[in-house]
């Protein structure tokens, strides 16, 4: 077995939700109480879905993406797994903006070190990962760590071991 783990970035490696909350507060928005359980930002902020998606796009194209902190204990466990021979690839729906992508890559390397064999953070969050996963990983027996149920299911359907 190839000891490879495919990783989502936001909510797995980086605490995107925390950084987005800080940024939204700076834009004058306040998250609704007891909304941690929601993945959908329109529900977390009580705003129209189109407005939420527009705000996500602005955030994902901002310099903030170069400074998102690590998610919980992700650095500790990625380092441990790397030290026992696991390899990692990162697939992320950030934005098509090349500067935002470079900031994301630099932030990942700054936080985790040079542990990633491949990083693609240029997927459009409005499109998703289904076709990309199919094209790149179909038939592979890799682990797939993803915080979105829809994306995790897309990986499972092509043979990845979704966690």
Where are these regions (language model features)?
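Short catalytic/ligand-binding loop motif for oxyanion handling, primarily in non-cytosolic enzymes
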Residues: 14-16, 22, 88, 97-101, ...
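Short, acidic loop-to-helix structural element flanking the phosphoryl-transfer center
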Residues: 51, 57-90, 97-102
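Active-site neighborhood of HAD-like aspartate-dependent phosphohydrolases
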Residues: 1-53
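Short hydrophobic segments within beta-strands
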Residues: 8, 91-93, 145
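A structural signal for isolated positions on well-ordered beta-strands in alpha/beta enzyme cores
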Residues: 87-89, 143, 161-163
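A short, structured active-site edge motif that brings together acidic residues
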Residues: 89-96, 105, 111-129
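Anion (oxyanion) recognition and catalysis
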Residues: 25, 79-83, 156
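Conserved Lys-Pro-Asp/Glu-containing loop-to-beta segment of HAD-superfamily phosphomonoesterases
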Residues: 126-156
